[in-house]
């Protein structure tokens, strides 16, 4: 089936999803499995650039992921330490892989890396003990460091560094919600968190512990501009606070968290400058 045919079949199945279950066979199951295979191989993505700055979300692929949970029954997944097993609906991406398959895929996955089937890892990527959920996309040359999480349907570009313990949040529901997107050449600091469909523009640096969701104020220190949901390309971002409103009795109110763009750099500066130097005021 073409992508258009798959999309039509999955959209129709989604409208009648109450009737979809582990016993469902035929075109619905075939379409969902084909969609997951496209995601797993990188031939299709939940979100892709449609222009110089805009991202298009392929909602039918998110629906395929959700339908797969209805289609697939729970099963034992072997391979745990000490002969332990897991109990889940989604097998490992690496189930049945041998050395030739890993060499062909072209990325590194160290012991402790958990990658679910239906996610794509591009050649040259390095996965430390981390978690990559289904529907996610990890670009060429990207490092996913220890205990970092790439959530369901999250999109991470080329040559990024997702530092230890950082969270790139996933999104399956609500259905209309957009995935988190980390564009090419970004650095996400340790224990930082990007959630709720936020887009981090190309070449940006998020310092350790920066949290950005859809309602987080992102303030450009140089201009005073306040923005939401998108970090402009080549921004250097740190955690900050903004004065709160006075309390009813007139005393100062609590300060509120925000993310602060402390500087913007061009591509050449970003390529030549070390991360610590960029973050230094």
From Swiss-Prot:
Presence of the UniProt keyword Oxidoreductase in the record: no
EC primary class: transferase
Reaction catalyzed: (S)-2,3,4,5-tetrahydrodipicolinate + succinyl-CoA + H2O = (S)-2-succinylamino-6-oxoheptanedioate + CoA
Coiled coil: none
Residues holding substrate: 108, 145
A GO biological-process term: lysine biosynthetic process via diaminopimelate
Subcellular location: Cytoplasm
Cellular component aspect of the GO annotation: cytoplasm
Keywords: Acyltransferase, Amino-acid biosynthesis, Cytoplasm, Diaminopimelate biosynthesis, Lysine biosynthesis, Repeat, Transferase
Location, primary (coarse class): cytoplasm
EC id: 2.3.1.117
Pathway given in the UniProt record: Amino-acid biosynthesis; L-lysine biosynthesis via DAP pathway; LL-2,6-diaminopimelate from (S)-tetrahydrodipicolinate (succinylase route): step 1/3
GO molecular-function terms, A-Z: 2,3,4,5-tetrahydropyridine-2,6-dicarboxylate N-succinyltransferase activity; nucleotidyltransferase activity
Subunit annotation: Homotrimer.
Family per record: Belongs to the transferase hexapeptide repeat family.
Name under which the protein is recorded: 2,3,4,5-tetrahydropyridine-2,6-dicarboxylate N-succinyltransferase
Organism in which the protein naturally occurs: Methylobacterium nodulans (strain LMG 21967 / CNCM I-2342 / ORS 2060)
Gene: dapD
